[in-house]
Design a protein with these regions (language model features):
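Short beta-alpha junction loops
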Residues: 1, 127-128, 165-166
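Cap/insert and terminal regions of metallo-dependent hydrolase folds
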Residues: 63-156
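Charged, amphipathic alpha-helical linkers/stalks
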Residues: 146-148, 156-169
């Protein structure tokens, strides 16, 4: 509500999306917000010829949760998703927890690719570098985009590792 309040006070047009209710925002262009947990949401975009699902950091790590989202989206052409942990994963001594979190994240992506059958997956959320002296140890087990490519190399999907200023046709 704070974001909405800020925009309306500054005279911006604001349209708050209702969950799982498609909004037509142009000819052949619909967006749907999918609630995930308490704070997160996914964005599903449909154009005349593409279906794009941005899971960002949604917690889609079980078949049942993937099935719930699939009921809204069906198969998609492009899947955007988080590829590593981006938050605290224990103190310095908890290396095994961080390694497990990284492995689980790659397994989550594989599950998502199996369910949504995208033509391409874009690992984009998690370009994090822990730079503070007190937390830089968290970098010891993060995934990199190449880890996603290696995990999915036997699946029928193009892993599109984008860099700043890249764009999709």
């Amino acid at each position: 509500k704070r974001v909405k309040s800020f925009f309306t006070q500054n005279e911006f047009n604001f349209n708050e999306l209702k969950f799982e209710e498609p909004l037509l925002i142009g000819n052949n262009y619909k967006i749907t917000c999918i609630k995930d947990g308490f704070y997160d949401s996914a964005l599903f975009i449909q154009t005349k010829d593409k279906k794009i699902l941005n899971l960002n950091d949604c917690y889609v790590r079980t078949k049942s949760r993937a099935n719930e989202i699939y009921k809204v989206t069906g198969k998609c052409d492009i899947l955007l998703t988080q590829f590593s942990y981006a938050a605290w994963k224990g103190g310095k001594e908890n290396l095994s927890w961080r390694k497990l979190a990284s492995k689980e994240k790659l397994n989550d992506i594989a599950l998502q690719v199996k369910k949504f059958e995208p033509k391409q997956v874009i690992p984009f959320a998690s370009f994090v570098y822990f730079s503070n002296e007190s937390n830089k140890y968290l970098n010891d087990s993060v995934n990199w985009p190449k880890d996603v490519s290696n995990k999915l190399k036997h699946m029928d999907v193009f892993v599109n590792i984008m860099k700043p200023f890249d764009y999709l046709d």
